[in-house]
């Protein structure tokens, strides 16, 4: 009955146009009535406690760092260096898009922000160069979803808080699969570019490459600081977020001198709006997660899947399919917040490496961001590239196919994720 109440309120709320956060609060209130324990004060306190976490403080810092990068000239310099290096290759702008997305991923941690920033810079150039815009936009959208995988990752922070796992370990575990996703996309683009006979950009001189490198090195140094700090134990994810925001602000104002006080004010407003949306969603989900636990929903799921516990691989496949289905119709953050407390006890009972599970969870949900019928990143790329949603779906289809194929490879060869983490540590 608890499952029906929760799903009914969630789907009903979404159907009438409620934001996900309010739909989750509705679910929480309905479960409290059903459990005969409704109390506004308890709900309010749980809501506050849901966002009262030092680890979650990393989110506004990384959001702010991403906003400063876009407004302060860091993003365009990050795109310019790959442009000078590989832009002259056949279909070179596609490689630039993936490389820029991977570098941006190591700075922003948000798929939507990453996709919007890279697409705004590259899609007009691709259109002018007579690239098939839907295919090019699909590639950039697919590159954008690497942002939740390569550290610093906002979804990893949320997953770590929800599951009690080390956020630093999750960050380190995301490096190798994120790079593999990027390599897979570039290989797919190489195959397509060879068939489409795409034009080349003018080859940059060594002087132009050097100038681009010198100009962009301040921006490129940021992921070195973040990952180096994690690796050395110099700072926590929250402290890393503060360092990233301060460093980005320093570079934008002192080095590049493209950040005015008026621009900074708009950046702070934008970061505050984004942070408020994410944190309210986290807090609302915490209310539902707490009541789901009281209603013993995790135990029900555990009992349902108990016969598969002795076969961890089969159990893991079933869980991945379930996450895939949910991720296709729901955004990444609420999927993580709702399913993590339900699935994590079962994962631990089956002896599945929880860090590996966390990485696979986020990869699966990230691909869902470019998978119809919802596809939030697809909506972003459609708007930026001025494409119909159907055209964006056709453009992204081959990349979705290869990314899900890579996900299957990760399922059957977990060492591709686990071993690089051991090497890094």
From Swiss-Prot:
Q: Which GO terms describe its cellular component?
A: membrane; plasma membrane; tripartite ATP-independent periplasmic transporter complex
Q: Which Pfam families match?
A: DctM (PF06808)
Q: What processes in GO biological process is this protein linked to?
A: carbohydrate transmembrane transport; cellular response to salt; regulation of single-species biofilm formation
Protein location: Cell inner membrane
Q: Does the keyword Transport apply?
A: yes
Indicate the principal place this protein occupies in or around the cell. Answer: membrane
Give the protein's function: Part of the tripartite ATP-independent periplasmic (TRAP) transport system YiaMNO involved in the uptake of 2,3-diketo-L-gulonate.
Quaternary assembly? The complex comprises the extracytoplasmic solute receptor protein YiaO, and the two transmembrane proteins YiaM and YiaN.
Protein name (Swiss-Prot/TrEMBL): 2,3-diketo-L-gulonate TRAP transporter large permease protein YiaN
State the species of origin.
Answer: Escherichia coli (strain K12)
Gene, per the UniProt record? yiaN
């Amino acid at each position: 009955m608890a499952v029906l109440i929760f799903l009914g309120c969630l789907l009903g709320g979404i159907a009438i146009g409620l934001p996900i956060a309010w739909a989750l609060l509705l679910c929480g209130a309905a479960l409290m009535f059903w459990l005969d324990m409704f109390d506004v004060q308890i709900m309010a306190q749980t809501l506050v406690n849901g966002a009262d976490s030092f680890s979650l403080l990393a989110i506004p810092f990384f959001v702010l760092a991403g906003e400063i990068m876009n407004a302060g000239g860091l993003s365009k310099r990050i795109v310019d260096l790959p442009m000078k290096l590989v832009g002259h290759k056949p279909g070179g702008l596609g490689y630039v898009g993936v490389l820029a997305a991977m570098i941006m991923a190591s700075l922003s941690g948000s798929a939507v922000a990453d996709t919007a920033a890279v697409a705004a810079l590259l899609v007009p150039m691709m259109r002018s160069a007579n690239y098939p815009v839907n295919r090019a936009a699909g590639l950039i959208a697919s590159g954008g979803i690497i942002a939740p995988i390569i550290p610093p990752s906002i979804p990893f922070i949320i997953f770590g808080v929800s599951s009690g796992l080390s956020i630093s370990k999750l960050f380190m575990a995301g490096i190798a699969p994120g790079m593999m996703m990027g390599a897979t996309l570039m290989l797919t683009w190489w195959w397509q570019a060879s068939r489409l006979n795409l034009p080349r950009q003018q080859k940059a001189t060594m002087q132009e490459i050097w100038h681009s490198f010198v100009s962009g090195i301040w921006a490129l140094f940021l992921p070195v600081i973040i990952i180096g700090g994690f690796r050395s134990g110099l700072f926590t994810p929250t402290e890393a977020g503060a360092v990233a925001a301060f460093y980005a602000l320093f570079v934008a104002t002192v080095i590049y001198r493209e950040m005015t006080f008026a621009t900074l004010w708009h950046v702070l407003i934008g970061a505050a709006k984004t942070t408020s949306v994410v944190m309210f969603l986290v807090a609302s989900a915490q209310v539902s997660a707490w009541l789901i636990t009281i209603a013993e929903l995790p135990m029900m799921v555990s009992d349902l899947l108990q016969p598969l516990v002795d076969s961890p691989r089969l159990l893991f496949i079933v869980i991945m399919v379930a996450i895939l289905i949910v991720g296709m119709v729901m955004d990444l953050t609420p999927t993580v917040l709702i399913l993590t407390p339900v699935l994590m006890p079962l994962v631990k009972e089956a002896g599945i490496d929880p860090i590996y599970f966390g990485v696979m969870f986020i990869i699966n949900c990230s691909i869902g961001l470019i998978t119809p019928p919802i596809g939030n990143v697809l909506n972003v790329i459609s708007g930026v590239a001025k494409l119909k949603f159907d055209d964006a779906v056709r453009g992204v289809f081959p990349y979705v196919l290869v990314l899900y194929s890579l996900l299957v490879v990760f399922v059957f060869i977990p060492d591709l994720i686990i071993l690089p983490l051991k090497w890094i540590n």
